[in-house]
């Protein structure tokens, strides 16, 4: 039987974890062999009510009717939560889920907040499924789309990218800047990136192994790696829903740093701006020389002209030097070779599993 791994990045998501687990478990009942002990974030109900709920879950599981309706194979599932150093009650809630659902829920706790990309990387490293689905816990990535992603995988696609057609929680400015980011990225990079692709995607075991072995940069953009790694790809359009509690953890500053690092990581074109600027400067100088010779007049006099030209030239020069500095900063991060993340504790997992499996 094939295995399905669902990797969920969690950072201060206590307000939405209960809703996410309920929604995801309901979907998994339709496509996977899942067994659930009673799990709730409030006080446990009466024993009679608990038995009734367990009996109903077992009945739904045994019938297999949902799996037939979804039109996909039967899978054995694991729900892998990666706690990215949360400071709220998320770690406690995740541990409770893991203890009450040992056959389904796995939890990885980081020693501190390493970032969303690091959390997805940990899920990539520890997941054991034949098909891996990455999503967030705020329900903007709807679990109801999991069966459709599985169907695409069963059709033979190794990469299933989810493309946003609408984002209910994003304003006009964020949507415009997102479109501009992909426009610039596709112009600067020799690779093609699907516009409005999100961190909601699925990959096969083969793609997972390639990403684990060859894509180990410290400054990361996993969804970009997924789109650039090759293999057969397909897309599914979806509308991102409203956040079910909490707020976005991406500030304007974080988005700027993330966008800048991504552009620099996937393109060396900015390094060539110095050549372009030098050609433009030489061309302007040649025009000025021809103008002087034809009119038999001296070069334009006055301090204003000289100051403007010098300011322009130094602006171009420092801009190019700044770009080179950004690339050197990226190289510096790679040379330090510090870990992408540090695991402090795991639940229902072997903490040393990934280190044992690594052969590179």
Stretches found by the model and what they are:
Residues 3, 223-360:
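Hydrophobic helical membrane-anchoring modules
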Residues 3-5, 78:
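Cell-envelope/extracellular polymer assembly enzymes that use nucleotide-activated donors
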Residues 13-35:
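Short, well-formed alpha-helical segments that are part of the catalytic scaffolds
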Residues 18-19, 88-96:
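Acidic helix N-cap motif at the loop->helix transition within catalytic regions
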Residues 32-38, 71-85, 108-109:
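Short beta-strand/loop segment that forms part of the nucleotide-sugar
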Residues 83-91, 139-140:
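A conserved acidic beta->alpha catalytic loop
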Residues 96, 108-112, 116-126, 131, ...:
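Acceptor/aglycone-binding surface of glycosyltransferases and processive sugar-polymer synthases
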């Amino acid at each position: 039987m094939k295995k399905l791994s669902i990797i969920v990045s969690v950072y201060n998501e206590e307000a939405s974890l209960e809703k996410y687990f309920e929604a995801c478990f309901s979907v998994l009942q339709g496509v996977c062999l899942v067994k659930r002990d009673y799990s709730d974030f409030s006080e446990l109900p009466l024993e009679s009510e608990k038995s009734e709920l367990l009996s109903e879950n077992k009945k739904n599981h045994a019938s297999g009717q949902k799996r037939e309706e979804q039109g996909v194979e039967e899978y054995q599932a694991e729900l892998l939560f990666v706690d990215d150093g949360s400071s709220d009650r998320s770690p406690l809630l995740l541990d409770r889920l893991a203890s009450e659902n040992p056959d389904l829920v796995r939890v990885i706790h980081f020693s501190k907040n390493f970032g969303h990309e690091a959390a997805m990387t940990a899920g990539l490293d520890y997941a054991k499924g034949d098909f891996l689905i990455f999503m967030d816990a705020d329900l903007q990535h709807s679990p109801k789309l999991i069966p459709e992603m599985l169907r695409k995988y069963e059709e033979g696609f190794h990469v299933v990218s989810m493309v946003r057609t609408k984002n209910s929680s994003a304003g006009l400015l964020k949507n415009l800047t997102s479109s501009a980011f992909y426009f610039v990225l596709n112009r600067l990079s020799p690779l093609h990136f699907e516009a409005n692709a999100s961190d909601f995607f699925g990959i096969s075991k083969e793609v997972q192994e390639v990403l684990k072995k060859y894509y180990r940069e410290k400054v990361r953009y996993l969804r970009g790696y997924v789109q650039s790694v090759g293999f057969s790809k397909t897309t599914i359009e979806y509308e991102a829903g409203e956040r079910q509690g909490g707020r976005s953890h991406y500030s304007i500053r974080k988005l700027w740093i993330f966008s800048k690092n991504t552009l620099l990581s996937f393109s060396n074109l900015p390094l060539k701006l110095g050549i372009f600027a030098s050609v433009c400067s030489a061309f302007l100088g040649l025009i000025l020389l021809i103008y002087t010779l034809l009119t038999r007049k001296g070069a334009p006099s006055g301090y204003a002209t000289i100051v403007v030209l010098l300011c322009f030239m130094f602006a171009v020069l420092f801009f190019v030097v700044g770009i080179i500095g950004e690339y050197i900063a990226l190289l510096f991060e790679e040379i330090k070779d510090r870990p992408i993340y540090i695991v402090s504790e795991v639940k229902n997992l072997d903490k040393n599993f990934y280190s044992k499996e690594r052969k590179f």
